[in-house]
């Protein structure tokens, strides 16, 4: 009984791959395997120990995940590369003994001491933490938060923090990122979230805008209508009518020098009155952060162009 090899090649045989480029010495054909690139005629070794830059094929199994981790983020001073040492439980959720908990506490203390290589990094970490807190309180998107963090980094590199509060510059960076992205937030909305007074936040933003030349577009009144309508619980019909009133007011030229949030609230109040929606002047003023007299003044202006 004759036997034959069931496979076309042995398992330890190198896979030969041809290339289109000829040998630089004799012009003969070139063969490439997993270790080297050799000319088939003259035996010249053209390349060896090449790196396989192709994709890595493996099982897509959550239990065997490798080289995974959180993505890099500008919202942390080290881009998110620092190690976080847990406490209380291990990776399986099992409670740790008292001796291991004390050991982890000592490791966390030493790791915290080694996080900051300089005072500059410590100030950067404090400022970015403040930015994350303010962005979370305002419900900003991660992209706006990351842009605010990058703006704070630029301000620190340009030495704009010298003689100024870190908290004020952090709040100013958040407001600057909102302005650059066309978000309907005023400095009156951002400053109360900061740990310093509004005057210091305004001064810090003025420095940022003048020194860095922020590309801040003009504030548009129609940007405030959707957010105020959501806060006041207005219907889509009322919101659309308020947006129409804003367009009419801009065309009539009565919006010059007005408080944008207050005028948008007045448009919502007028639209609610037209559609018999339950919205009072006090509620509209509270949502916009203005007085009732401001709502009435803008209402009278709107009545002059509507009639």
UniProtKB/Swiss-Prot annotation:
GO terms for biological process: DNA-templated transcription initiation; transcription preinitiation complex assembly. Residues 54-121 are annotated as: Disordered. Residues 54-66, 107-121 have a biased composition (Basic and acidic residues). One of its GO terms (molecular function) is DNA-binding transcription factor activity. InterPro entries: Cyclin-like_dom, Cyclin-like_sf, TFIIB, TFIIB_arc, TFIIB_cyclin, Znf_TFIIB. It holds the Pfam family TFIIB. Keywords: Metal-binding, Plasmid, Repeat, Transcription, Transcription regulation, Zinc, Zinc-finger. Zn(2+) binds at residues 23, 26, 39, 42. A zinc finger (TFIIB-type) spans 19-47. GO terms for cellular component: transcription preinitiation complex. It comes from the Archaea. Belongs to the TFIIB family. HAMAP family: TF2B_arch. Stabilizes TBP binding to an archaeal box-A promoter. Also responsible for recruiting RNA polymerase II to the pre-initiation complex (DNA-TBP-TFIIB). This is Transcription initiation factor IIB 5. It comes from Halobacterium salinarum (strain ATCC 700922 / JCM 11081 / NRC-1) (Halobacterium halobium). The lineage of its organism: Archaea, Methanobacteriati, Methanobacteriota, Stenosarchaea group, Halobacteria.
């Amino acid at each position: 009984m004759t036997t034959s090899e069931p496979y076309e090649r042995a398992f330890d045989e190198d896979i030969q791959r041809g290339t289109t480029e000829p040998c630089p010495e004799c012009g003969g054909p070139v063969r490439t395997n997993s270790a080297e690139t050799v000319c088939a005629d003259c035996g010249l070794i053209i390349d060896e120990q090449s790196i396989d830059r192709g994709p890595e094929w493996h099982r897509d199994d959550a239990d065997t995940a490798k080289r995974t981790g959180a993505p890099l983020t500008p919202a942390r001073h080290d881009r998110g590369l620092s190690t976080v040492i847990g406490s209380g439980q291990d990776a399986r959720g099992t409670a740790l003994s008292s001796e291991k908990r004390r050991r982890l506490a000592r490791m966390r203390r030493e790791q915290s001491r080694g996080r900051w290589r300089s005072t500059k990094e410590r100030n950067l970490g404090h400022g970015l933490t403040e930015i994350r807190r303010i962005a979370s309180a305002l419900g900003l998107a991660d992209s706006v938060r990351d842009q605010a963090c990058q703006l704070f980094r630029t301000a620190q590199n340009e030495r704009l923090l010298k003689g100024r509060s870190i908290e004020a510059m952090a709040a100013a960076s958040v407001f600057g990122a909102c302005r650059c992205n066309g978000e309907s937030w005023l400095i009156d909305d951002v400053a109360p979230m900061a740990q310093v007074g509004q005057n210091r936040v305004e001064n810090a933003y003025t420095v940022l805008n003048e020194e860095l030349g922020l590309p801040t577009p003009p504030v548009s009144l129609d940007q405030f209508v959707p957010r105020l309508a959501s806060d006041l619980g207005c219907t889509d019909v009322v919101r659309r009518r308020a947006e129409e009133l804003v367009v009419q007011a801009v065309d009539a030229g009565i919006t010059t020098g007005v408080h944008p949030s207050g005028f948008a609230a007045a448009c919502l109040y007028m639209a609610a009155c037209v559609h018999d929606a339950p919205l009072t002047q006090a509620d509209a003023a509270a949502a916009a952060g203005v007085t009732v007299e401001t709502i009435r003044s803008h209402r009278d202006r709107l009545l002059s162009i509507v009639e």
